[in-house]
Regions:
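Short active-site neighborhood of thiol/selenol oxidoreductases, capturing the structured segment around
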Residues: 76-90
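Typically the conserved alpha-helix immediately C-terminal to a functionally engaged Cys/Sec
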Residues: 93-108
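The canonical Cys-X-X-Cys-His
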Residues: 89-93, 145
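Short, solvent-exposed mixed-charge patches
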Residues: 182-185
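Thioredoxin-like thiol-disulfide oxidoreductase module
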Residues: 110-162, 166-173
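Sec-dependent signal peptide cleavage junction
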Residues: 10-60
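Bacterial N-terminal signal peptides
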Residues: 1-7
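A short beta-strand-turn-helix
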Residues: 61-80
Length: 185
């Protein structure tokens, strides 16, 4: 009986060696394919990002601009949306482009909000402004949205991930978000 057991173990080891050799040989091609796919995806994202409008201004005084928007919001009876992110962030640029090129969403924003692209980048992290709004990017990533009332009071912070659909955004989810915090119905 012990010789049978030893033979069984030896056969298992022998077949393991063959399968390991095969796996090691086969693993090279998929790794090369994966690297090529990753490089192609990176290039496609870079090309897409290059074509999209760049709404964030790293040199702008965000604190002063938001103060101006609060005054304007009172006069126009609108809330404010701060879209936090940067020109480095493809999802930030996609969201901006999505809203600007979707007439229904653009109309909701134009009718109900003053919209500001709050820059977060290596050049200008706007740390003081972000701290005032509880550093939403640390919690949710970018883009992240902060809704302010006409007095500048924070009403809501919106994670953008729940608005995504595929490689873009859901019109219905974004519309629902915009309408929920709108000043007018």
């Amino acid at each position: 009986m012990s010789s049978l057991l030893i033979t069984g173990v030896a056969c298992a080891q022998k077949s393991d060696v063959k399968s390991t050799d095969k796996v090691a040989t086969d693993a090279v091609a998929p790794e090369q394919d994966s690297a090529a796919i990753a490089a192609a995806k990176k290039k496609a994202a870079s090309d897409e990002k290059a074509k999209l409008p760049k709404p964030y201004n790293a040199e702008e005084n965000a604190e002063a601009r938001i103060a101006e928007l609060v005054k304007q919001a009172k006069a126009e009876n609108k809330n404010i949306i701060l879209q936090a992110g940067g020109n480095w962030c493809i999802w930030c640029l996609r969201f901006n482009n999505f809203v600007q090129t979707t007439p229904e969403l653009k109309q909701i924003v134009d009718d109900n909000y003053l919209y500001y692209h709050l820059n977060y980048s290596p050049e200008n992290k706007n740390a003081k402004v972000f701290a005032k709004y509880e550093n939403p990017g640390d919690k949710f990533g970018y883009p992240v949205f902060v809704v302010l009332d006409q007095n500048g009071k924070m009403l809501h912070t919106q994670d953008s991930a729940v608005l995504e659909e595929g490689k873009g955004y859901s019109t219905e989810k974004v519309k629902e978000f915009f309408l929920k915090w709108a000043t007018k119905s």
